[in-house]
């Protein structure tokens, strides 16, 4: 579960986070 409060929290899960929504990180597809 990729939890976040804002998109900055997503950098620990994603190289290029797309958004934080409903407490979950969404990542851009990796190259």
From Swiss-Prot:
Record-listed Pyrrolidone carboxylic acid modification sites: 1
Proline amide modifications at: 31
Disulfide bridge partners, by residue number: 4-20, 10-25, 14-27
Record's keyword terms, sorted: Amidation, Disulfide bond, Ion channel impairing toxin, Potassium channel impairing toxin, Pyrrolidone carboxylic acid, Secreted, Toxin, Voltage-gated potassium channel impairing toxin
Domain of life: Eukaryota
Post-translational modification summary for this protein: The N-terminus is blocked.
Cellular location(s): Secreted
Keyword Secreted: yes
Coiled coil regions in record: none
A GO cellular component entry from the record: extracellular region
UniProt note: domains: Has the structural arrangement of an alpha-helix connected to a beta-sheet by disulfide bonds (CSalpha/beta).
Similarity comment text for this entry: Belongs to the short scorpion toxin superfamily. Potassium channel inhibitor family. Alpha-KTx 17 subfamily.
Protein name: Toxin BmKK12
Species of provenance: Olivierus martensii (Manchurian scorpion)
